[in-house]
Each structure stands twice: as C-alpha cells, then as structure tokens.
UniProtKB/Swiss-Prot annotation:
Residues of the signal peptide: 1-18
UniProt-recorded name of the protein: Tol-Pal system protein TolB
Subcellular location: Periplasm
The species this protein was found in: Rickettsia typhi (strain ATCC VR-144 / Wilmington)
Annotated GO biological process: cell division; protein import
Gene3D superfamilies documented for this protein: TolB, C-terminal domain (2.120.10.30), TolB, N-terminal domain (3.40.50.10070)
Length: 443
C-alpha cells in the first residue's frame, strides 16, 4: 500500500507559536469550528477531485466529534489555494477558528499532487502544511491523510481516518448469508471477500493491513482458519483446528497468535508460533477460557474465563504465568480488547434488569489497583458486542443488534463511540454488519 508520497509544506514561519490541544479524556468537548475551503485545481477534472477531497476531509473531522465544519455557503473570502495569506478577519467573522486551504494538480507522471495548509485564524499563523503525490485512484486516501494531519495537530493524537475495517456482512433476508467484507473506516469502498456459501466468523487483520484471517465452517462441525492476502486475493488454509470457534489474534510482532480451542469439555487459550506451527497451551484447569487479546507490547494477554463461576476478565503473561483477575463488577464479561495505547481494555458486559438481559460496552484500566473497579460503561443496548479500537486508542467500534419483529428478522449494524461514551455514530454498510476489526493506519 506504499503508493502515497508525503512532503511537509511550510510557507510561513511557525516561530514562537504553541497550540493548545484538545484532550478528549476530559469528557465531552465543544467541537472546534473549522472551514475547509474549496481546493484550487489546474483542470475541470481536478476541480471535481478537489470538491470530493474537501467533502471527505470535512466528513472525517465531523465524524471525530471534535470539529464542526462550517458550511461553505457562509464563506466570505473568495480567494482559494495555498499561495496566498488568507484574509483572517473574514474567517473570524464566520467564527472559523481554523481554516484549511488546498490545491490539486496533475504531475507529468500522471499522479495527483494534493496540497494543503492549516491556519489558525485568530493568531493568524500557519499550523501545518503538507502535500501528497498519489495515483489518481487514491485521491480519497490522500484526503484521509490530510484529515489525519489536521486531527493530530489539534489533538496531539495520531489520526485514524486512513484505515480499513474488516467485518462480517449479513443479509437482512432469511436465510441469512454471511460474507467477509472490507471497507474504509467510514463505510466507503465496501467490497466482499468471500462468496457467502460457507458460514464465516471473526475476521482479523494480521500484523499488517495487507492480510486477514477468518474462520470458515466447511461443514457444520469442521472449522478452518483461512488467510487471505488483500493485495493478490490469494487464499490459503492456515490450519484445521478442531474445537476452534474464533479466528486467532496476532502478536504485535506478527510472529505468534493466540486462540481458544475446546477439548474434552474445557476451552483453553493456546499460542501458536506461526513459523513452526507449534501450539503452546497457556491456561489449565476446568472451565471456558476464550477471547484472548495481546497487549501492545506483546508481553501480556487479556482473556475471559468462567473458572470461578461467572465469566470474568483476567490478565496473564504471554507465557501463561502470573494470572490475575481485573474485573470485579456484577454481571458476566466477554470479548476483551486491549487498547493500542495500552491504557484501557474494552469489553462486553452482560447484566440483567427485571429478568431481561442487557448488553453493555465498557472500558476499564488495564492495570487497576488491587480489587479496584475501574470500569466505565459507555453504551448499552439489546445486543452490543465485539468492541475493537481505532489505532490511536481513542475510538471504539462495535456491533449493535436489534431483535426480530413479526416476520422481519433481527439485524446487526456497526457503530463507533469515543472512549468517554460520547459521539455514537453508525457506520453505513450495504447490509447488516457485525464482528468489526480495525486496521492500523495504512502506509
């Protein structure tokens, strides 16, 4: 995916300026008003590309919940492009704290050069500028890259817009057909990776975003783990693991993977060396141990286990030693997912109210004090589950289900929410959707 060339672009001095950043951990924040101006273009075709780039940048920033793009209908200044200093008073008049100017040009190579500058309209300073050289078909990724740069400059955290989501697509009509699908983080460029002839579950990205793994049931009793190369489309069977029901999760270095396998009435966590295919059993005793997830440094594994009666969350060293419980609230816990930052673990929690099951998505500290209940529920519903993290550890994606009504089957959709429990949004997909997995930022 190394098709984007990136350059820093500085036209005006930044000397002596320090920007106050947004910290979303402080709770709900007022979105920063930003004007994304029309991009200059060297042709009518590139004018259309520029308009599309502006739309993607604005949408990315709006989706984050931290920015409020201002409608172009209120713009006063008509000058566009990156080779002039804006009339800042005109932008302040429409309450734009930030201004984005840009341009799109075609190079002799046939590639597009997409440039931008981000301005602070009150201090009248350039904050950042950059240009991207991309094949024409990758203009959308360049727009995501620009939004990433803006997000990082203002928040201090890396952006997450130039990413992919792999998930299970579900037809809404009966009988339900499930297929592995891939899309941009915002739902664009959706494509199907499997044909729907077999039951498929739990797609996972490998060490990079170039490959995925998933479970497919060739028969009702036989599950196979498949590897699919997203560049070539080539697919191969990784293993025929009797008793496996979820795809493996991979270590940060890509050399190992963990999975749960049921044998002899118990389900245990196993680690596999991907080079030698050697399996190492990490848990013991009786009970069901499932949903392992590595810490960002690969030294720890979080998982859920019912060995003490009710499913709770536990952390152990990656060799299976030093097991300790980290969940202490009421209810049962499932599907833990370790934040890429290493500070939090997301989870599904099932509680009961008036005899009805309630599903919750929550987060807790990865390293709480002894018996500290550090968890915080951020959303609840009829069936919310399968949390996963954005690569910057600031947003959680999950699936939400609705029950069947009359002759209409139930449906599942994918949503995002920030770690404070605000800004819940649906990710639009062509059909039902569940089991999302978020890629790292693309190269």
């Amino acid at each position: 995916m190394r098709n984007i060339v990136y350059f820093i672009l500085t036209l005006f001095s930044l000397t002596g300026y320090a920007l106050e950043t947004i910290n979303i951990e402080h709770g709900r924040v007022d979105p920063t008003p930003i004007a994304v101006n029309k991009f200059n273009a060297d042709s009518s075709n590139n004018d259309l590309v520029g308009n599309a780039v502006v739309k993607v940048i604005s949408n990315d920033l709006k989706i984050s919940g931290l920015f409020r793009p201002i409608s172009s209908a209120s713009f006063i200044e008509e000058q566009t492009g990156i080779n002039y200093k804006p009339l800042f008073a005109a932008w302040r008049q429409i309450n734009a704290s930030l201004l984005v100017n840009g341009e799109v040009q075609t190079l002799e190579s046939g590639k597009l050069k997409i440039s931008f500058i981000l301005w602070d309209t009150f201090l009248e300073k350039q904050l950042i500028g950059a240009l991207f050289e991309v094949p024409t078909k990758l203009w959308r990724r360049a727009a995501h890259k620009i939004a990433d740069k803006i997000y990082e400059k203002i928040t201090g955290d890396p952006g997450y817009f130039d990413t992919k989501i792999v998930y299970v697509s579900e037809s809404t009509a009966l009988p339900k057909i499930k297929r592995i699908a891939l899309m941009d983080y915002d739902g664009a460029n959706n494509k199907y990776l499997t044909n729907g002839k077999s039951l498929v579950l739990t797609p996972r990205f490998a060490h990079s975003a170039d490959k995925i793994f998933y479970v497919s049931y060739a028969t009702k009793s036989r599950a196979l783990v498949y590897e699919k190369d997203l560049k070539t489309g080539k697919e191969s069977v990784v293993g025929d693991f009797v008793g496996i029901s979820f795809a493996p999760r991979f270590s940060p270095d890509g050399k190992k993977a963990v999975m749960s396998i049921a044998k002899n009435g118990s389900t245990h966590i196993y680690e596999i060396d991907l080079a030698t295919k050697q399996l190492n059993k990490l848990t013991d005793g009786f009970g069901i141990n499932t949903s392992p997830s590595y810490s960002p440094d690969g030294k720890k594994i979080v998982y859920n286990s019912d060995k003490n009666g009710v499913p709770q969350l536990y952390i152990m060293n990656s060799d299976g030693s030093d097991v300790r419980r980290i969940s202490f609230g009421g209810g049962s816990y499932a599907s833990p997912s370790w934040s890429p930052r290493g500070d939090y673990i997301a989870f599904t929690k099932i509680t009961r109210h008036d005899g009805e099951k309630i599903f919750n998505i929550g987060i807790m500290k990865a390293y709480p004090q002894d018996h500290e209940n550090s968890e915080r529920i951020i959303t609840s519903g009829y069936l919310v589950e399968s949390p996963c993290w954005s690569p910057n550890g600031r947003v959680i994606m999950f699936s939400k289900g609705w029950p069947s009504r009359a002759k209409a089957p139930g449906k599942n959709k994918i949503f995002t929410i920030d770690l404070t429990g605000h800004n819940e949004r649906e990710v639009i997909t062509p059909a039902g959707a569940s089991d999302p997995e978020w890629s790292d930022v693309l190269n």
